[in-house]
Amino acid sequence: MQKRVVVLLLDSFGIGASEDAKDFGDFGANTLGNIAKACFNNLANSNDRNGALKLPYLESLGLGLSALKATNELPLGFESKPNLIGAYAYAKELSSAKDTISGHWEMMGAPVLFEWGYFKDKTHSFPKEILDEIMHKTKIKGYLGNCHASGTEIIKDLGEKHLETLYPIFYTSADSVFQIAAHEEKFGLDNLYALCEEVFQILEPLKIARVIARPFIGANREDFKRTAKRKDYAIKPHKKLLFEKFIEEKQGEVISIGKIADIYAHVGITQKFKAGSLMELCDVTLDQVKNAKNNSLIFTNFVHFDSDYGHRRDISGYANALEYFDTRLKEVLENLKENDLLILCADHGCDPSFKGTDHTREYIPVLFYHKDLQPAFLGKSESFADIGQSIAYFLGLSPLDYGKNLLKFKGQP
């Protein structure tokens, strides 16, 4: 029997601080819960939305109940007895991190059980010897930044100086990352990508997970804005991924939508589709759900929840984006084929009500839909790898090294 899997990952959509959140400075974080609370109390109203958070299709898959199991609190405004059509769980992260790559790798069978390299100093973040090597190997004449920063704020602060000097803007965060912002037209997109490739080669031995190209446009601080031509240069996964097993054992198609291919360093990806906005990501995903052949795994990362709303601590914007996504989820559900398995999950938290601008260490929702799957609570997962192991079971692949299968279909003992 031919099968397809559709994975929709809402980047940063955590459902409550995990038991080790205090170790990460994230005690009290709850991305979903705090958004729902603000909405319920009319503190997230805008021209685009108002009132309680309305996510009927996510609720029908078990989102609210998953959050209830994780935190012992039902998100405000959610139904305690929704019309449940999905099976649901919640998962903690085995990897000792709260970044995009660790979360994604773990769910496909490669938890990060080593320490990433980090740039922990808030100012003068990058060691002089690294900066000297970058200057020497890339021939750039100088750089700006060299600090922890919000990507949108640093281009406001340094964008005009960048246009005067054409020095790239270097910055980082609490994640294992080196980010480079430059003007897409004046500095040049190809020049930015080439610079990032060189920097990635320099930093790879230090286990820096990603170098990210952050192009922007505009003429002054009032109208600088990042473009959709971001590019991630990531370390290759250290273990065989579910994707590779699917290709080797079943000759499957692995379809990346959004930044999935970059996150996995393009390992095990057979088709790639980029998209600029949340609407475009939904459109491309729906098109693949309608048209991808059998024996396919469709995987979309919905980055805007994280980049546009979580990091920017925009509660109303996050709520509005969730409500829009929920309307598009309805279309996905209506267009699933007879033997499709749908999975919704996240990779970490990024609570827009929380201090700072960084990710938050949280449980994630794990929501399944298949016509033969009994709607039920599937338990607490001790690793995001349970997602990949469940997919491997569904597709008839050999087991992954990590995780356990969560799926139990109607008629099974």
UniProtKB/Swiss-Prot annotation:
Quote any Pfam family the record assigns: Metalloenzyme
Q: How is the cofactor bound?
A: Binds 2 manganese ions.
Query: Record's superkingdom?
Result: Bacteria
UniProt entry keywords in alphabetical sequence: Cytoplasm, Isomerase, Manganese, Metal-binding
- Pathway in which the depicted protein is active: Carbohydrate degradation; 2-deoxy-D-ribose 1-phosphate degradation; D-glyceraldehyde 3-phosphate and acetaldehyde from 2-deoxy-alpha-D-ribose 1-phosphate: step 1/2
* InterPro entries found in the cross-reference section: Alkaline_phosphatase_core_sf (IPR017850), DeoB (IPR010045), Metalloenzyme (IPR006124), Phosphopentomutase_DeoB_cap_sf (IPR024052)
Please provide the Gene Ontology terms (biological process) for this protein: 2-deoxyribose 1-phosphate catabolic process; 5-phosphoribose 1-diphosphate biosynthetic process; metabolic compound salvage; nucleotide metabolic process
Give the binding site residues for Mn(2+) 2.
Answer: 306, 311, 359
Record's protein name: Phosphopentomutase
- Primary gene name: deoB
